[in-house]
C-alpha cells in the first residue's frame, strides 16, 4: 500500500478504494477552521442549473431584461458545460447547508450519540462529531472532538415568520478539543451506549501504524459543554491499544449490543476486542477467510454474534463469532474481480445488506435468498450511476428504503428504492430527457472534492454530514 508523500498535492491515491489517504498541500491553514457561508461556494445539487451568461448592455429596458433572463436547464453529472455557461446551485432544495473548514482533512469521521433527544426537528440544531486527521507530518495527527451549535435553517421562504430570525445571530459555532495521535487515522468509529452501561463515550481509531486505540472522550465532551473544564494528559491517552494487527487497516465497527469491537486489516485478518471483567482483551487468533485486504465490516443490527465483512477479493462474508474455527459461514461473490470497498446493513430490515464496489456499482442483497455455498449471487437491486469507485454507503436510520452513496466522482447520491414509475410517468421522464436517470435516484449533492465518507444523523432526521479533502458539509435536503 502506498503511503502519503509530503509533496504539494491534494490528490488521494486510488488504490484500495476508500481506504487511501490523500496528501495535503503544505500551504493549508493549520488552524481549526470555521463555518463558511453555505452558498459562498458553488455547492451543487440535484437541482443544479446551467445558466447562459448574457451581454451586459443589450439596449433593453429593465422590464424587457426581466423577461429575458438567462435560460436555466437541469444539469446532471457528466453533462457538458459550454464556455458561456456556468453552474449555479439552487439553495431552495436544501433546508440546511453549512460548510466547515478544518485544520487537516478527515479521511474518516463519526457522529456522536448525545443526550439532546431523539427525532429533533426544531431549529437551530446542535451536534457532536469526531474526526481523524491525515496531516503532512505523521506526528502532527490528531483526533478532533467537535461541538457544532447554532445550526440554523438556511432555506427561507414566504411561510417563514420574519420575526423568527430577525434578532438572531445565525452564524454557526464550532468548538473543538484535540487528542494528539501518531500516524494518520484511517478509520474512526464511536460506540453507541448499550443499555445499562456506566461508560459514557467510547471511541475507536485505526491508524496507519497498524494500532487500534480505544478512547474515552467523555472528558472532552464535558470540556466543550462546560467552559473552564480542563482535559488532563491522562485523559488524552487511550484506554487500550490493539497490537495484534501486522499492518494498517480500514475496517472498524462497534457492536450495537455490547462493547465489542471488530477491526480488519490489509493482511486479510479480522480481530475481536471485548470488554469484560473490568478490562479489555483482544483475541489472540483472527477471523480468517478473506484472500485479500478487508475493506469494511459491520455487526448485524439484529443478531448479537453475527457480523459481515467485505474485501478486495470481490466478496462479502457473513460470520458468527461463536465459530471456533473463525471462518466465515457464508461467502457471496458479490462483485467478481472487483474490490468491494464498503457495506451497510439495513437496521430496519436486517435481511437487506448493501455493498459498494471499485467499479462504481452498488448493490442490495437479500440475505434470505443466499445459499451457504460460495457462488455468484444475484442482488435484488444494482445500480451503476457513479462513474468512479464507491467510497461510502449507509442506509437511512429511519426510512428502510432510503440509502446514501458516496462516489469518487465527487457525488453523494440519495436513493429511495421504494419508488416505482407507471408507464405514463416513464413517458413523462423520457420527454424531459431523464430516461437514463434511475427513478429511485432522488437527490445528488456535490460541491466537495474527494468525498470520502457520509453519515446520517440518527437523532436529527434527514440530516447528513460528509467529509472530503475540502472540509465537512452538514446538510438537510427537502427530499428527506
Curated annotation (Swiss-Prot):
Associates with ribosomal protein L3. It is found in: Cytoplasm; Nucleus, Nucleolus. Involved in regulation of L3 expression and stability and plays a role in early 60S ribosomal subunit assembly. May be required for proper assembly of pre-ribosomal particles during early ribosome biogenesis, presumably by targeting L3 onto the 35S precursor rRNA. GO terms for molecular function: protein carrier chaperone. It comes from Schizosaccharomyces pombe (strain 972 / ATCC 24843) (Fission yeast). Pfam families: CAF1C_H4-bd, WD40. GO terms for biological process: cytosolic large ribosomal subunit assembly; ribosome biogenesis; rRNA processing. The modification Phosphoserine is found at residues 163, 166. The lineage of its organism: Eukaryota, Fungi, Dikarya, Ascomycota, Taphrinomycotina. GO terms for cellular component: cytosol; nucleolus; nucleus. Keywords: Cytoplasm, Nucleus, Phosphoprotein, Repeat, Ribosome biogenesis, rRNA processing, WD repeat. It comes from the Eukaryota. WD repeats lie at residues 183-225, 289-329, 334-375, 385-425, 446-480. Its main location: cytoplasm. Signal peptide: none annotated. Residues 1-78, 155-176 are annotated as: Disordered. InterPro entries: Glutamate-rich_WD_repeat, Histone-bd_RBBP4-like_N, WD40/YVTN_repeat-like_dom_sf, WD40_repeat_dom_sf, WD40_rpt. Residues 28-52, 158-172 have a biased composition (Acidic residues). This is Ribosome assembly protein rrb1. The keyword Methyltransferase does not apply.
Amino acid at each position: 500500500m502506498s503511503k502519503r508523500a509530503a509533496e504539494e498535492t491534494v490528490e488521494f491515491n486510488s488504490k484500495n478504494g476508500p481506504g487511501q489517504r490523500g496528501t495535503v498541500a503544505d500551504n493549508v491553514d493549520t488552524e481549526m477552521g470555521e463555518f463558511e457561508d453555505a452558498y459562498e461556494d458553488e455547492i451543487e445539487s440535484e437541482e443544479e442549473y446551467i445558466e447562459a451568461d448574457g451581454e451586459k448592455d443589450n439596449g433593453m429596458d429593465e422590464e424587457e431584461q426581466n423577461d429575458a433572463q438567462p435560460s436555466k436547464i437541469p444539469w446532471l453529472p457528466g453533462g457538458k458545460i459550454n464556455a458561456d455557461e456556468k453552474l449555479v446551485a439552487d439553495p431552495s432544495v436544501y433546508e440546511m447547508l453549512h460548510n466547515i473548514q478544518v485544520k487537516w482533512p478527515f479521511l474518516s469521521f463519526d457522529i456522536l450519540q448525545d443526550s439532546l433527544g431523539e427525532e429533533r426537528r426544531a431549529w437551530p440544531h446542535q451536534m457532536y462529531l469526531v474526526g481523524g486527521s491525515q496531516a503532512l507530518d505523521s506526528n502532527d495527527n490528531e483526533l478532533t472532538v467537535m461541538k457544532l451549535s447554532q445550526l440554523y435553517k438556511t432555506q427561507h421562504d414566504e411561510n417563514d415568520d420574519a420575526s423568527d430570525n430577525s434578532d438572531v445571530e445565525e452564524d454557526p459555532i464550532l468548538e473543538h478539543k484535540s487528542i494528539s495521535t501518531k500516524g494518520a487515522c484511517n478509520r474512526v468509529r464511536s460506540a453507541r451506549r448499550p443499555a445499562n452501561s456506566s461508560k459514557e463515550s467510547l471511541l475507536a481509531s485505526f491508524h496507519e501504524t497498524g494500532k487500534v486505540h480505544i478512547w474515552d472522550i467523555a472528558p472532552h465532551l464535558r470540556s466543550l459543554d462546560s467552559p473552564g473544564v480542563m482535559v488532563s494528559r491522562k485523559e488524552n491517552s487511550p484506554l487500550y491499544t490493539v497490537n495484534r494487527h501486522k499492518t494498517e487497516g480500514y475496517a472498524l465497527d462497534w457492536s450495537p449490543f455490547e462493547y465489542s469491537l471488530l477491526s480488519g486489516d490489509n493482511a486479510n485478518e479480522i480481530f475481536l476486542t471485548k470488554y469484560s471483567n473490568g478490562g479489555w482483551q483482544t483475541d489472540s487468533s483472527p477471523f480468517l477467510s478473506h484472500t485479500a485486504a478487508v475493506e469494511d465490516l459491520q455487526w448485524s443490527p439484529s443478531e448479537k454474534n453475527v457480523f459481515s465483512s467485505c474485501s478486495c477479493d470481490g466478496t462479502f462474508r457473513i460470520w458468527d463469532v461463536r465459530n471456533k474455527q473463525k471462518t466465515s459461514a457464508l461467502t457471496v461473490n458479490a462483485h467478481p474481480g472487483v474490490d468491494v470497498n464498503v457495506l451497510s446493513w439495513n437496521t430496519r430490515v436486517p435481511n437487506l445488506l448493501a455493498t459498494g464496489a471499485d467499479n462504481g456499482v452498488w448493490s442490495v442483497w437479500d440475505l434470505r435468498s443466499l445459499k451457504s455455498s460460495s457462488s455468484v449471487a444475484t442482488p435484488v437491486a444494482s445500480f451503476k450511476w457513479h462513474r468512479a469507485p464507491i467510497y461510502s454507503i449507509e442506509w437511512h436510520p429511519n426510512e428502510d428504503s432510503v440509502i446514501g452513496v458516496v462516489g469518487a466522482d465527487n457525488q453523494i447520491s440519495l436513493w429511495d428504492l421504494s419508488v416505482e414509475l407507471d408507464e405514463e410517468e416513464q413517458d413523462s421522464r423520457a420527454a424531459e430527457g431523464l430516461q437514463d436517470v434511475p427513478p429511485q435516484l432522488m437527490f445528488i449533492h456535490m460541491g466537495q472534492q474527494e468525498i470520502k465518507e457520509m453519515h446520517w444523523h440518527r437523532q436529527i432526521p434527514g440530516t447528513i454530514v460528509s467529509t472530503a479533502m475540502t472540509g465537512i458539509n452538514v446538510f438537510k435536503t427537502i427530499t428527506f
